[in-house]
């Protein structure tokens, strides 16, 4: 956060002022700015992941001012970027923070600490697999002649049709494969032969292979199980999984730092004991 926030702000300012290229796209009457990034959705994803990390750091200490700043981000996204997935995910994150803030306040009045119910814990554990299975299966078996699939494909900006094409051309490999992709990012010129796997689940499964896909899903489960009584971590992981249905940033560690959580130590006392081993006595 110490490094990423200043760099992101500097990139935004440089892009907006013209010091570096600011790619500007149009969707209907809406203007979509990338603010120095390769594409508006990439810029928004970086901001969403940073805010999610900030929420995880602050947790119950998140103030109403901070929540207000998150709302301003949603308005900013809508006005300058038109990034529907990131906007929806940000709104969901805000609602989760407000809900947890209220639940913690009510629990404190009773002299206790809020812990999620067993049902909520189970739901959080199931959601990543449900979302992954839904996106993979609807892409693999997409049929434009089925009305609900056709409408869903339109809602998902043709992600199902492109996923179907990817499965037909490459299919699943154990250790992954090279899949050349052509996206809209990096240029405002019309792209010929657009082919980009936006969904993280389909992207990881086809490009990195079944083994890596299973390992990543297990890592998500490990993070949740290890922090099963930490509602903020559960909420953030679920939100990242929802975001990954439509966007491809799940396995980009410069964006999704949460995948490193299984290797992190959160216990202050444990860390202090570990440091004691390496202290040099005079």
Q: Where are each of the predicted segments found?
A:
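A membrane-periplasm/extracellular boundary helix in multi-pass inner-membrane enzymes
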Residues: 81, 98-150
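Hydrophobic transmembrane alpha-helices of multi-pass, membrane-embedded glycosylation machinery
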Residues: 1, 51-55, 71-75, 87-100, ...
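Membrane-interface segments at transmembrane-helix junctions in multi-pass inner-membrane proteins
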Residues: 7-59, 81-85, 197-204
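Helix-loop-helix junctions and helix-breaking kinks within/between transmembrane helices
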Residues: 40-41, 66-105, 205-210, 246-253
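Aromatic-anchored segments of alpha-helical transmembrane domains
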Residues: 6-17, 72-80, 128-136, 237-249
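Hydrophobic transmembrane alpha-helices and their immediate junctions
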Residues: 207-241, 266-270, 274
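Long extracytoplasmic/lumenal interhelical loops at the membrane interface
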Residues: 148-208
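Membrane-interface helix-loop-helix junctions at transmembrane boundaries of multi-pass membrane enzymes
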Residues: 57-68, 111-119, 221-236
């Amino acid at each position: 956060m110490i490094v990423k926030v200043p760099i992101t702000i500097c990139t935004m300012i440089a892009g907006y002022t013209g010091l570096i290229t600011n790619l500007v796209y149009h969707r209907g009457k809406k203007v979509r700015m990338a603010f120095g990034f390769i594409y508006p959705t990439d810029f928004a994803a970086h901001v969403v992941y940073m805010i999610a990390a900030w929420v995880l750091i602050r947790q119950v200490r998140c103030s109403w001012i901070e929540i207000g700043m998150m709302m301003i981000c949603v308005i900013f996204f809508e006005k300058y970027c038109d990034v529907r997935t990131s906007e929806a995910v940000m709104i969901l994150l805000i609602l989760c923070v407000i809900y947890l803030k209220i639940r913690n306040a009510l629990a404190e009045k009773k002299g206790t600490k809020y812990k999620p119910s067993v049902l909520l814990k189970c739901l959080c554990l199931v959601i990543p697999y449900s979302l992954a299975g839904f996106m993979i299966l609807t892409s693999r078996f997409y049929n434009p002649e089925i009305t609900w699939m056709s409408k869903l494909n339109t809602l998902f900006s043709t992600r199902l049709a492109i996923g179907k094409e990817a499965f037909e051309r490459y299919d699943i490999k154990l250790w992954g494969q090279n899949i050349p992709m052509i996206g809209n990012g990096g240029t405002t010129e019309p792209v010929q032969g657009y082919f980009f796997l936006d969904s993280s689940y389909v992207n990881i499964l086809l490009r990195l292979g079944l083994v890596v896909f299973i390992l990543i899903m297990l890592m998500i489960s490990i993070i949740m199980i290890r922090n099963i009584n930490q509602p903020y971590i559960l909420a953030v992981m679920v939100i990242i999984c929802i975001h990954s249905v439509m966007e491809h940033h799940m396995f980009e560690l410069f964006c999704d730092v949460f995948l490193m959580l299984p290797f992190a130590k959160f216990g202050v006392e444990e860390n202090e004991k570990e440091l004691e081993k390496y202290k040099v006595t005079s």
